[in-house]
């Protein structure tokens, strides 16, 4: 039986991002996203890969898995399993640019 997974854009709501990120990473990630620091490499419903500026350019991958959102970033902060500023920026841009989230 095939299991249904929500899209990455559906998973990265404000509540989840606030819960996963530290206050400083949340602030920095919002600033990076607001200033155009996110460039999508691949953007599909279940997998997003982005290059994110923030000091140095890092690569972020967001995945929709059976247990919810999975993520990785090439920065040192993410290696500690934290939702770093780069992940925040990529998540916010994914949500903001999702066709189902646009306001007409």
Briefly describe each language-model feature range:
Residues 1-104:
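Long, low-complexity, compositionally biased intrinsically disordered regions
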């Amino acid at each position: 039986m095939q299991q249904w997974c929500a899209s990455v854009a559906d998973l990265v709501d404000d509540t989840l991002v606030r819960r996963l990120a530290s206050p400083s990473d949340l602030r920095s990630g919002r600033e990076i996203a607001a200033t155009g620091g996110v460039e999508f490499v691949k953007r599909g419903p279940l997998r997003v890969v982005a290059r994110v500026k923030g000091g140095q350019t890092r690569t972020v991958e967001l995945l929709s898995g059976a247990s919810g959102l999975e993520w990785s970033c090439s920065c040192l902060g993410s290696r500690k399993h934290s939702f770093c500023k780069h992940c925040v920026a990529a998540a916010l841009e994914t949500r903001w640019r999702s066709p189902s989230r646009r306001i007409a």
